């Protein structure tokens, strides 16, 4: 028996397809050939800020054991399944497959981390493929080889979550999804906090169903396989489910965010965590988006809390100059219309600056609030006529509404990788030792 890791990526397009669906098909096909799975299919979300991603930027890895004589058939089946289900007609879809037969080396783990947190080049992936005797297959420019190799290298031995994904029958794809909304809300109430991001609490919007033409009916995310399977069993679908699979994933783990020491280290397209003081008061621009600038001793950068971020936007609006914060988010490159900007996913307030208001002094004779006679000309009292050029405005410290702590964008606008509040304190430190029995259908 040999161990085999099969990584693949970039099969979908905005019009159709889903790389997880290719994985779901292969789960059944590889079982039929005689392979046994050593892990749930791994769904690895890569850097969400790369400009060439299709939709969710998710790569897949299937980890199996099989007899050596089955390897060729498994490889042929994988290549055929990817080719038949990828949208090769779309200009931005460039599928890639990697077959890896060794234990996962540190070099590959490092490559995976860099692919999740930054930008890597094809030549780096191909160098590793050659170095470790892997085999790679690319369609068109084969960019999916990068994601496929990264999915193999990310073994999810630290924090991870699970997602059960259900798929529609071919005849229903492209039509409105038919699921009983009340059953989703019931599922949410019964399974929280072991599942997360099912229903947006601010708007009551259902979050488990995608809106595009892809084959997914719904996906439920949670802390363990039993929780997501139980949640799936509560949901009442009003259309047939073709198949479903439980994936192990880096969803909701903040795996993409990399802490940097200085604003000067910021690079376009990289997700970062960086500390800085507010340089000036936040500005609300057309559309309701809130923009503010943070600075440190080495530079400054704009931060944007867009209108859909909900709670985060409201928090950003209440910040003042001098507040010390950590900004979490992806870096948008500069353009002719705006500078380099961090698109915010989270804000951690570390220190609140005092908010000071200045008032005219009260008259020392009659206690009425005095009026200014002009810049540096002193004050006069309209009631008793007293005047003074020596009195100064009185500083009053106002109570801040904001509190120190972590603030996260509303659930409806959280990215796949963003760790929600519910998950703090639930981080995992090890991969699972065994799998549940029925983790896919058929």
Residue spans for each PLM region:
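Flexible glycine-rich surface loops and low-complexity tracts that mediate binding to linear polymers
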Residues: 274-279, 321-337
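OB-fold/S1-family single-stranded nucleic acid-binding modules
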Residues: 332-360
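Short nucleic-acid-contacting surface segments enriched for D/E, G, S/T with interspersed K/R
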Residues: 310-326
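Long, hydrophobic alpha/beta structural blocks
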Residues: 74, 78-261
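OB-fold (S1/OB) nucleic-acid-binding surfaces
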Residues: 283-309
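OB-fold nucleic-acid-binding modules
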Residues: 233-280, 286, 315, 348-355
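Short cysteine-rich clusters marking metal-coordination/redox-active sites
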Residues: 363-366, 381-384
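Long, charge-rich boundary regions
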Residues: 392-442
């Amino acid at each position: 028996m040999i161990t085999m890791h099969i990584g693949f990526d970039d099969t979908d397009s905005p019009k159709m397809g889903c790389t997880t669906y290719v994985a779901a098909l292969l789960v059944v096909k590889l079982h039929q050939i005689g392979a046994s799975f050593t892990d749930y299919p791994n769904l690895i979300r890569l850097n969400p800020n790369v400009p060439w991603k299709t939709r969710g930027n998710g790569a897949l890895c299937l980890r199996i054991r099989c007899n050596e004589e089955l390897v060729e058939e498994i490889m042929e089946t994988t290549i055929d399944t990817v080719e038949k289900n990828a949208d090769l007609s779309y200009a931005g879809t460039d599928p890639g497959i990697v077959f890896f037969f060794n234990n996962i080396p540190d070099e590959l783990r490092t490559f995976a981390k860099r692919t999740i947190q930054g930008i890597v080049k094809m030549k780096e992936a191909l160098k590793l493929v050659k170095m470790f005797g892997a085999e790679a297959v690319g369609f068109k420019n084969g960019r999916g080889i990068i994601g496929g190799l990264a999915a193999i290298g990310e073994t999810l031995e630290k924090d991870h979550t699970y997602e059960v994904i259900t798929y529609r029958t071919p005849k229903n794809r492209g039509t409105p999804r038919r699921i009983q909304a009340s059953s989703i809300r019931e599922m949410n109430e019964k399974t929280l906090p072991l599942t997360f991001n099912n229903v947006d609490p601010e708007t009551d919007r259902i979050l488990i169903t995608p809106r595009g033409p892809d084959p997914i009916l719904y996906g439920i995310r949670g802390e363990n396989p039993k929780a997501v399977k139980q949640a799936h069993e509560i949901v009442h679908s009003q259309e047939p489910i073709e198949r479903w699979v439980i994936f192990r994933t880096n969803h909701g783990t903040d795996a993409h965010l990399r802490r940097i020491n200085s604003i000067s280290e910021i690079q376009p397209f990289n997700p970062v965590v960086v500390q800085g003081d507010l340089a000036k008061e936040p500005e609300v621009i057309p559309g309701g988006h809130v923009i503010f600038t943070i600075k440190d001793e080495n530079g400054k950068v704009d931060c944007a809390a867009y209108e859909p971020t909900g709670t985060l936007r409201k928090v950003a609006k209440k910040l003042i100059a001098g507040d010390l914060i950590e900004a979490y988010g992806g870096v948008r490159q500069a353009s002719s219309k705006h500078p380099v900007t961090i698109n915010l996913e989270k804000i951690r307030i570390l220190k609140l600056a005092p908010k000071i208001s200045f008032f005219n002094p009260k008259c020392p004779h009659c206690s009425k609030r005095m009026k200014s006679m002009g810049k540096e000309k002193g004050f006069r009292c309209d009631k008793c006529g007293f005047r003074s050029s020596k009195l100064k405005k009185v500083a009053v410290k106002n109570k801040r509404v904001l509190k120190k702590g972590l603030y996260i964008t509303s659930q409806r606008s959280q990215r796949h990788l963003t760790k929600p509040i519910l998950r703090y304190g639930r981080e995992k430190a090890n991969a699972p030792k065994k799998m549940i029995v029925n983790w896919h259908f058929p």
